[in-house]
């Protein structure tokens, strides 16, 4: 797994717990010319699309999508928050790390780190607040245990 460089330059270690490692999904991207705006770097809206793509890929890979559909539900975005730390440019390769940070009754926070491949620098951090809703009515509904179990939570002390 690609891990960002630590802030103080120390060696990063990672737990060997299989569930934890499976909870952090990696989504690889190569920045294209169409991702770049007039300022010459990746446009802020592109990060949101990458967040959506990474979350969907993780939900599909973990079985969350299938399990949610089986109970007649889906996920919708409530809010996004992004902190931009360093720009990305056409040709850059970036790994989006994403994981569930918590589950509440009808909501879940998913976190993201954007790590530039060539130097391991975290170029952005983000969060999405997702709401679990009934697919027919669009109304929030409680997240059942079988859905929660598809995506084990990564606690703050174990985040990359």
Describe every region a protein language model picked out:
Residues 2-95, 101-160:
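Terminal targeting signals and extreme-terminal segments of soluble enzymes
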């Amino acid at each position: 797994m690609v891990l960002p460089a630590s802030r103080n330059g120390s060696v990063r270690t990672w737990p060997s717990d299989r569930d934890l490692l499976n909870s952090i999904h990696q989504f690889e991207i190569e920045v294209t010319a169409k991702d770049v705006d007039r300022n010459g770097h990746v446009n802020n809206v592109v990060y949101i699309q990458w967040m959506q793509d990474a979350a969907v890929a993780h939900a599909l890979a973990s079985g969350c999508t299938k399990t949610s559909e089986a109970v007649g539900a889906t996920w919708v975005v409530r809010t996004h928050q992004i902190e931009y730390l360093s720009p990305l440019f056409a040709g850059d390769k970036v790994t989006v790390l994403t994981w569930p940070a918590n589950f509440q009754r009808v909501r879940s926070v998913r976190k993201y780190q954007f790590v530039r491949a060539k130097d391991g620098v975290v170029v952005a951090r983000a969060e999405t607040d997702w709401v679990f809703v009934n697919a027919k009515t669009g109304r929030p509904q409680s997240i059942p245990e079988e859905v929660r179990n598809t995506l084990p939570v990564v606690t703050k002390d174990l985040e990359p």
